[in-house]
Amino acid sequence: MTTVARRILLAVAALWAAQSCQAKTVTYNFNLTWVTANPDGLADRKVVGINGQWPLPVIEVDKGDQLVVNMHNGLDRSATIHFHGMFQNGTNTMDGPSMLTQCPVSPGLDFTYNFTVAQSGTYWYHCHTDFCYPDGYRQALIIHDSEAPFHNDYEEEMTITMSDWYHTMTEDLAPQFLSLYNPTGKEPIPDAFLFNDTMNSSLAVKPNTTYLLHLVNIGAFVSQYFYIEDHTFRIVEIDGVYTDPVEADTLYVSVAQRYSVLLTTKNTTDKNYPIVTVADSALLDKIPPNLQLNNTNWLEYNAAADHPQANITVALAKDLIPFDDMTLVPSDHMPLLPDPDLEIEVTVQMMNLINGYGYAFLNNISYTAPKVPILYTVMSAGDLATSSEIYGEFTHPMVLEHNQVVQIVLNNGDTGTHPFHLHGHNFQMIDRAPSYGATFYDYLNGDPVAYDSGNHSAFPAIPARRDTFVLPPQGYFVIRFVADNPGVWFFHCHVDWHLSQGLGMVMIEAPTQMQERLHIPQQHYDTCQAAGIPVAGNAAANTQNLLDLSGQNAQPGWLPDGFTARGIVALVFSCLSAILGLGFIVVYGLSDLKFHAASNTAGAPATASAANPEEQLEGAAGYRD
């Protein structure tokens, strides 16, 4: 070895040692229990508390730290934690989605999440079992980085969360939403919109100071606009991806999306300025008269000065023009990936099945959880792990080969927007349906427009990257990534109501490499045993013949041809009308018999048939005929 080579090797080793010494283990102990909260001042309700407190703690770590979260489930229902945006490279067992990478953690049990934080930026954590994070189990996760390109450009930092809020527990809302009486799938309307889990709050700032603001939409449904009156800011990060700084004044933040911005305050302290969040009313089927869509909090320069309300109305909000995230350039200037080795094209549809409920579909498949967590199927399947069949039809599995360039084309056959998130990756955003109005988010109100591989916009040379994108109504979106992270990764709509309807599919990435590199900890098996869930076999829990899917969990059957949601509504109300009509006839008949019986009382004693309720009903039936 030459002297120069030896010096380089020693320098690299020293740098690695220095970084290793700086890294630390950060431990959080989470005891989940129900607590009472009233963040909007309108209604008390139960929420998921941690260590008896709500709002929940913001997790803060440095890049390179080991994060350990010891969760004790003191609730009366199952729970998990997903650390949204974490790649979990080599630690797929720590990703958190129930029945994909682990079993749900039953009441009374403990579960430890333990992984190295190899990323930086703005993230969040939330429950990833059926209907739990709208009950308050969600909060920001901030990863500090002393080597961020903008590290020396600010003096202080703050975290801002925005979310929708329901006064009713999801266990009560869910049966109304997934119901024969809601065939069109109208989502529950929130009761309020929160800012840092409260309302009418202030962020105290100093004059002539630059702040790094971490913005996170931790809601379950509604996207929100964000701006600060008479201020601009510089975008420097989206979803954990550093960007070349770009000035903006308004952001559109869907659920699960994040931004970091640099805000430099004014020199004077004579007034305070509204921080405005505006719920996207286009997502709501109706707007209750008491629902406050536009909410004002304050950038507070002077606590003694007035705190003015924002100069915004519902009508004016329709004219807001947010910054287009597709135009951002990652600071690493990663070029467009080469042509894909695999293209996956799917279409979003919202339809009804034979039970009359409204479901969500990707290519006519509504995601249905398997009987065995998918990661465990991979690990127990041997050579058959590369066969998509063993994972079941209704998990909508896509087996990806290691290091393939994958392109997902998502067409939207629905009139609503859908924020889609891919676990385990960020991706290049390379194309989106063209707008049909003055701004990039105005789309055709007519027939859906599908992606045409032979006639599309020019792909950007350096595409923006993030892990959650907004699929436009009746349009399309195209993303591209490298399958370099072996694991089971969920790809799903992050509107929690839509996920409950089945709007998701699964990427089974490099199953052979998973078997070689991953190890399932014993706590996983213990958790499954407590829940009575098998830990081996195919999607139907068949360990003898992995290609036999008999008994797999499946979506309900299809409606007969020609049935529509409107037809279901008509049928339901026709049946109800018929039942009510029969009831009125019965009541009328009984009242008529009673009238005749009363008329005969003066002249003769009551007969046995008149005193016998069964005979009265028989008489009424005879009268009805």
Q: Residue ranges of each PLM-predicted region?
A:
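Asparagine-centered strand-capping/turn motif at beta-strand->loop junctions
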Residues: 71-75, 215-219, 409-414
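Fungal secretory targeting signals
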Residues: 1-23
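N-terminal, post-signal-peptide metal-ligating segments of extracellular/periplasmic oxidoreductases
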Residues: 16-110, 143, 152-155, 171, ...
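C-terminal substrate/ligand-recognition segments
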Residues: 388-429, 474, 483
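Active/binding-pocket-proximal capping segment
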Residues: 229-242, 413-455, 485, 496-501, ...
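Histidine- and aromatic-rich segments of cupredoxin/plastocyanin-like copper-binding domains
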Residues: 92-99, 103-106, 161-162, 170, ...
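Alpha-helical transmembrane segments
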Residues: 578-592
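Extracellular/periplasmic metallocenter environments
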Residues: 75-76, 88, 97-155, 251-305, ...
